[in-house]
Amino acid sequence: MSTIVRKLISTANAAKPVAPYNQAVVADRTVYVSGCLGLDKDTMKLVPGGPTEQAQKALENLEAVLKAADSGVDKVIKNTVFLKDLNDFGAVNEVYKRVFNKDFPARSCFQVAKLPMDALVEIECIALTGSVETKTVQ
């Protein structure tokens, strides 16, 4: 049986983890990106504003981590979005569809009681590396 290499991803181009975990882990050709918050990578503070601004920054952090893992938003197969208030669903979707604007990945969205650092939005994903072909089956 061959050994699968587990690569631990860390990039200075995204906010650092706020607890003991890696920004992402790559196993074989699959990238598991930890939850990204709307943190400024330099100050490690939540960006000013509300759910729209936090979602935008969280997605920028997610994109930076994906790039460090030799992947990208076009290779994301599953997103999970955590919201402090599900009433922010529409506002977050407006930001989300600017980043994921075609061939949408699978996605779940949950309202949660609390997020780290009192964030309003957290986004994690699973993506692929290497060459990826998309086919639509109906």
From Swiss-Prot:
Entry's Gene Ontology cellular component terms: cytosol; mitochondrion
Keyword Chaperone: yes
GO MF annotations in UniProt: deaminase activity; protein folding chaperone
Keyword terms of this UniProt record: Chaperone
GO biological process, one term: mRNA catabolic process
CDD domains referenced in this protein's UniProt entry, alphabetically: YjgF_YER057c_UK114_family (cd00448)
InterPro entries referenced in this protein's UniProt entry, alphabetically: RidA (IPR006056), RidA_CS (IPR019897), RutC-like_sf (IPR035959), YjgF/YER057c/UK114 (IPR006175)
The keyword Hydrolase is assigned to this record: no
Pfam assignment, any one: Ribonuc_L-PSP
Residues passing through the membrane, by range: none
Family (UniProt): Belongs to the RutC family.
Chain's role: Molecular chaperone. Seems to fulfill an ATP-independent, HSP70-like function in protein folding. May protect essential factors of cell proliferation during heat shock. No role in calpain activation.
Name under which the protein is recorded: RutC family protein UK114
Species in which this protein is naturally found: Drosophila melanogaster
